[in-house]
Structures are given as structure tokens and as C-alpha cells.
């Protein structure tokens, strides 16, 4: 396995004293070069849909930090836009979408096969990255999981408790299930095209999985992930897949096996020693440093990074954060992190 890229070795089940490292949102506003390129693009969505500039911001943290993986620069809400939803971003507030709250909203949506015209620039970005990344760097594609994407499509924005989505799920299950099926089908096609374009790994982000409890979690977080992963694996048998059902709590146990994922990403609420005992037995674990420490820096950052590394080095581990790096993080703290992990 020594000839494989380091991240792929972890995904294949190899334990290492020094794990591969990448960070969620590693291409982002904490980097001055990102801010300059985003200004050049004009706005966030224009950056996402410009293959040359999107590839540039994806490559920036690789040049600066030599991470073991590079994740495509895009957004989980490009699928709703490709399906026919209006999408725009409000400065300082985040995304806004036209809402789907009933059957008439669903009737306006395109089919899963109609998304590629909108999303072709994303596939072009992947093709550029597959050519330009260093040979030792793994290219990760991604999409939002159906439940998380649905919460935005129903509410028209991010919501702290996902109440509008829960209301539709309980009050009009027929419309809700149709929406979930459509997003699931579109996600399969989107990720399939990313892999065809050159993505070596894909990750499924279910940022709001933790708001689903009991049977609802199994139906709307676990089952769609299983369907997506099963279909992708049928088309690409050797494709490694990372699943991130954020804040799943005890539902993390057995999740990777249940959905067929090669790696389970965990949030900051999970203790690394507990993860080693309860999750790493199923395969690779990714995580899970608190992003706040990327702002704090210093020995607090270095010692916690070493603690997580050492707790999980008995099995396959990809070092990452428990959530995305924040705009107020100091880029110099990334060097502190990498020195701590790699020393």
C-alpha cells in the first residue's frame, strides 16, 4: 500500500503514526489569497461557477500548507439551484433560496437528469484540479446530504432548529418524501459526474443530521446516505466515500457500516478516545479538532491536536476539524497544527 496516496491508505484501513491531514473549508475567507480571488470573481456564486478561479482557490491551501487532500471548492446548495430553485447570498447572513412548501413547489422542480447543464462548470473545475494537484494530493468531491439540503430548500435559508423542514416532514409527508427522493437522485448524478471528472474520493455532508431523532434519523439521514453510496459504489466499485452525519451522537455507532461508507467523519462533541473504542472498529475515522482552537492557536492547539492524533493512531484516521475552519482563524495557526501532528 506504500505506493498509494496517504489519504487513500487511511481510507483503505491502514493505521499510521502520522495521519493524513486536511481541513473542512480549507479554501476560505481566513486566507488573504482567497479573499483576493473572490473579489476578482465578483461574488461567491460567480466564484463557484468559474472553473479557473474555483480551481485556483482550491489549490491555494495546498500551495500554502501541503495538505494531504484537496476538496473541491463549491457549495452544497448548487444542487437546489440546478433543480430550479432561485439561490442568492446575502452578505453577512448567508444563503437564500426560493422555498418549497407544498406540491406546487415540487412541480416547478427539474428532474435529476436535468442538473448537468447548470453544474457543468463544477465538473470542469474537477478536471482542472485532477491535472494540477500535486501527485501525492488526493482530490475529494462532495455534496450535501438530502436532509440537510432539504432543510434549506424548505425554509429558504439556514435555520437553527430546522423547524420548517420538520413541519413539512410531519404535516405533508408525501411532498417531503418526493423532495427527498429528488435530492437523493440528483446527488447520485452530481457525485457520479465529479468522479468521472477526476474526484478520487467523495464526501457526503449531513450538517443537520443531529436534529433527526429515532426512526426519523434512520429514514431521512441513514437511508438516503445508504442509497447514494450503494449506487455510487455500483458505478465505481473502488470509490472511497466519507460520510459526515454531524451531531449524530449515539447514532454514529454503526453508521459507516450501515450506509456502506469507508470513513466516518465526526464532530467536536465526540471524544477521540471514545471514537477509537466505538467507531474505529468499523474503519476509518475523520476528525475532530474544535475549529475554535484554530483561532486560539499556541500550545492549546498543539496539545489538543497531539491528543486526538495519539488517541486515534491505533486505527485508520484522517486528521481534520469537527466543523469548518472559521474566517477569523489565523493562517499561522495551521502551521502550528501541522507541526504538532507531523512531528
Swiss-Prot record:
The keyword Lyase applies. InterPro entries: UROD/MetE-like_sf, Uroporphyrinogen_deCO2ase_HemE, Uroporphyrinogen_deCOase. It catalyses: uroporphyrinogen III + 4 H(+) = coproporphyrinogen III + 4 CO2. Its main location: cytoplasm. The record marks 75 as: Transition state stabilizer. One of its GO terms (cellular component) is cytosol. Keywords: Cytoplasm, Decarboxylase, Lyase, Porphyrin biosynthesis. It is found in: Cytoplasm. Belongs to the uroporphyrinogen decarboxylase family. This is Uroporphyrinogen decarboxylase. The lineage of its organism: Bacteria, Pseudomonadati, Pseudomonadota, Alphaproteobacteria, Rhodobacterales.
Amino acid at each position: 500500500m506504500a505506493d498509494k496516496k496517504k489519504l487513500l491508505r487511511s481510507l483503505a484501513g491502514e493505521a499510521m503514526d502520522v495521519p493524513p491531514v486536511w481541513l473542512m473549508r480549507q479554501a476560505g475567507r481566513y486566507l488573504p489569497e482567497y479573499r483576493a480571488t473572490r473579489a476578482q470573481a465578483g461574488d461567491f456564486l460567480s466564484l463557484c461557477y468559474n472553473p479557473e478561479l474555483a480551481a485556483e482557490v482550491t489549490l491555494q491551501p495546498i500551495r500554502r500548507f501541503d495538505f494531504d487532500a484537496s476538496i473541491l471548492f463549491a457549495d452544497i446548495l448548487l444542487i437546489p439551484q440546478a433543480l430550479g430553485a432561485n439561490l442568492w447570498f446575502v452578505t453577512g447572513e448567508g444563503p437564500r433560496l426560493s422555498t418549497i412548501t407544498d406540491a406546487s413547489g415540487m412541480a416547478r422542480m427539474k428532474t435529476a437528469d436535468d442538473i448537468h447543464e447548470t453544474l457543468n462548470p463544477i465538473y470542469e473545475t474537477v478536471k482542472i484540479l485532477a491535472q494540477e494537484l500535486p501527485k501525492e494530493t488526493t482530490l475529494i468531491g462532495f455534496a450535501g446530504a438530502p436532509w440537510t439540503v432539504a432543510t434549506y430548500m424548505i425554509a429558504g435559508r439556514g435555520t437553527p432548529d430546522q423547524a420548517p423542514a420538520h413541519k413539512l416532514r410531519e404535516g405533508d409527508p408525501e411532498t417531503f418524501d418526493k423532495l427527498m427522493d429528488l435530492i437523493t437522485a440528483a446527488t447520485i448524478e452530481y457525485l457520479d459526474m465529479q468522479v468521472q471528472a477526476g474526484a478520487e474520493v467523495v464526501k457526503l455532508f449531513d450538517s443537520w443530521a443531529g436534529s433527526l431523532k429515532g426512526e426519523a434519523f434512520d429514514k431521512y439521514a441513514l437511508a438516503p446516505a445508504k442509497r447514494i453510496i450503494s449506487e455510487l459504489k455500483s458505478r465505481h466499485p473502488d470509490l472511497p466515500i466519507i460520510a459526515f452525519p454531524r451531531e449524530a451522537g449515539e447514532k454514529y455507532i454503526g453508521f459507516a457500516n450501515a450506509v456502506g461508507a469507508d470513513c466516518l467523519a465526526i464532530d467536536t462533541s465526540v471524544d477521540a478516545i471514545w471514537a477509537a473504542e466505538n467507531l474505529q472498529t468499523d474503519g476509518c475515522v475523520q476528525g475532530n479538532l474544535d475549529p475554535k482552537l484554530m483561532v486560539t492557536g499556541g500550545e492549546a492547539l498543539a496539545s489538543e491536536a497531539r491528543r486526538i492524533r495519539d488517541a486515534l493512531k491505533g486505527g485508520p484516521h484522517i486528521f481534520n476539524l469537527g466543523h469548518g475552519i472559521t474566517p477569523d482563524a489565523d493562517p499561522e495557526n495551521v502551521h502550528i497544527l501541522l507541526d504538532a501532528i507531523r512531528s
